[in-house]
């Protein structure tokens, strides 16, 4: 599977795993919890930065403080979803300024799953939260390196190779082409008018 970063290569593999493989056990899903939280913080931080760049104002004054609180979070260290952050993110998401910023998302880099997660923060913030299959499918984690996934379809073994799509990862692609019978190049239809992050 080839394509630029965020073109859907890993999502395609996840779909294949759900449809034709073993799917995701409860333990597998639990492993995505932290990543869902991180995706929420990453999305909100991207919008907070874009608010400044696009010169959009918050309608509600308290959201300046909420933005500062969320902006200072080190996303890599996020493992839980504390109430003060949940409240800040919900309040920010409800601000007309952030909604205008979201509507202009093609002008900056924002994950496709941002609205999906931000509109469902209450469910995700509950104690004992276990990601659904849809939550798992929408998690954005940049692929680094080369990962092979075998699938058995009607007694035929398919080996799909997922490679990182970021520019720095593309030089590794050539090593994948020995004994290859098919190549799928994926393109995200939702990004035809977006600015490429690189």
From Swiss-Prot:
Highest taxon above the source species: Eukaryota
Location of the region described as G1 motif in the Swiss-Prot/TrEMBL record: 1-11
Annotated GO MF terms: G protein-coupled receptor binding; G-protein beta/gamma-subunit complex binding; GTP binding; GTPase activity; metal ion binding
Subcellular location: Cell membrane; Cytoplasm
Membrane topology qualifier: Lipid-anchor
Location of the region described as G3 motif in the Swiss-Prot/TrEMBL record: 158-167
Residues the entry annotates as binding Mg(2+): 10, 143
Domain G-alpha intervals: 1-198
Protein family membership: Belongs to the G-alpha family. G(q) subfamily.
PANTHER family in the record: GTP-BINDING PROTEIN ALPHA SUBUNIT, GUANINE NUCLEOTIDE-BINDING PROTEIN SUBUNIT ALPHA-11
Protein name, per record: Guanine nucleotide-binding protein subunit alpha-11
Organism: Canis lupus familiaris
């Amino acid at each position: 599977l080839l394509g630029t970063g965020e073109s859907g290569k890993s999502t395609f593999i996840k779909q294949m795993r759900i449809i034709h493989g073993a799917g995701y056990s409860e333990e597998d899903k639990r492993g995505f919890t932290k990543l869902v939280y991180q995706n929420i913080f990453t999305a909100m931080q991207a919008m907070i930065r874009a608010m400044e760049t696009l010169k959009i104002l918050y309608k509600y004054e308290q959201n300046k403080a909420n933005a500062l609180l969320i902006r200072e979070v080190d996303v890599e260290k996020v493992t839980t979803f504390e109430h003060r952050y949940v409240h800040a993110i919900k309040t920010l998401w409800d601000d007309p300024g952030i909604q205008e910023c979201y509507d202009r998302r093609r002008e900056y880099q924002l994950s496709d799953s941002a609205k999906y997660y931000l509109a469902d923060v209450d469910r995700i913030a509950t104690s004992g939260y276990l990601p659904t299959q849809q939550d798992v499918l929408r998690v954005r984690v940049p692929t680094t390196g080369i990962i092979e996934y075998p699938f058995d379809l009607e007694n035929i073994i398919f080996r799909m190779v997922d490679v990182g799509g970021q520019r720095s990862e593309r030089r590794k692609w050539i090593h994948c082409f020995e004994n290859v019978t098919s190549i799928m190049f994926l393109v995200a239809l939702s990004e035809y008018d977006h600015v490429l992050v690189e």
